[in-house]
Amino acid sequence: MYPAVVLLLLLLVEQAAALGEPQLCYILDAILFLYGIILTLLYCRLKIQVRKATVASYEKPDGIYTGLSTRNQETYETLKHEKPPQ
């Protein structure tokens, strides 16, 4: 909206009519460049706010591994081979 207002003001001023084609293109390029930067900043700000709201609303009451405990046994135990009684 602001770039459109600036463009209209430039066109209404008498000096704007005195500008040649290249200068007018440079002005329009600068306006579009600023417009792109503003939109990018607003988009990034919106994404950050949504991410913060999502993280804040996510509550982790219990973890996935809450009820599990570590094993007291080793992973590889030696086998005790007993001879059968004779």
Swiss-Prot record:
The modification Phosphothreonine is found at residue 78. One of its GO terms (molecular function) is IgE binding. The keyword Transport does not apply. Residues 1-18 form the signal peptide. GO terms for biological process: antigen processing and presentation of exogenous peptide antigen via MHC class I; antigen processing and presentation of exogenous peptide antigen via MHC class II; cellular response to low-density lipoprotein particle stimulus; defense response to bacterium; Fc receptor mediated stimulatory signaling pathway; Fc-gamma receptor signaling pathway; immunoglobulin mediated immune response; innate immune response. Residues 19-23 are extracellular. The keyword Phosphoprotein applies. Pfam families: ITAM, TCR_zetazeta. Coiled coil: none annotated. One of its GO terms (cellular component) is Fc-epsilon receptor I complex. The chain crosses the membrane at residues 24-44. InterPro entries: CD3_zeta/IgE_Fc_rcpt_gamma, FCER1G, Phos_immunorcpt_sig_ITAM. Keywords: Cell membrane, Disulfide bond, IgE-binding protein, Immunity, Innate immunity, Membrane, Phosphoprotein, Receptor, Signal, Transmembrane, Transmembrane helix. The modification Phosphotyrosine is found at residues 65, 76. Residues 45-86 are cytoplasmic. It is a single-pass type I membrane protein. Residues 54-82 form the ITAM domain. It is found in: Cell membrane. The modification Phosphoserine is found at residue 69. IgE Fc receptor is a tetramer of an alpha chain, a beta chain, and two disulfide linked gamma chains. Associates with FCGR1A; forms a functional signaling complex. The signaling subunit of immunoglobulin gamma (IgG) Fc receptor complex. As a homodimer or a heterodimer of CD247 and FCER1G, associates with the ligand binding subunit FCGR3A to form a functional receptor complex. Associates with CLEC6A. Interacts with CLEC4E. Interacts (via ITAM domain) with SYK (via SH2 domains); activates SYK, enabling integrin-mediated activation of neutrophils and macrophages. Belongs to the CD3Z/FCER1G family. Adapter protein containing an immunoreceptor tyrosine-based activation motif (ITAM) that transduces activation signals from various immunoreceptors. As a component of the high-affinity immunoglobulin E (IgE) receptor, mediates allergic inflammatory signaling in mast cells. As a constitutive component of interleukin-3 receptor complex, selectively mediates interleukin 4/IL4 production by basophils priming T-cells toward effector T-helper 2 subset. Associates with pattern recognition receptors CLEC4D and CLEC4E to form a functional signaling complex in myeloid cells. This is High affinity immunoglobulin epsilon receptor subunit gamma. It comes from Cavia porcellus. The gene is FCER1G.
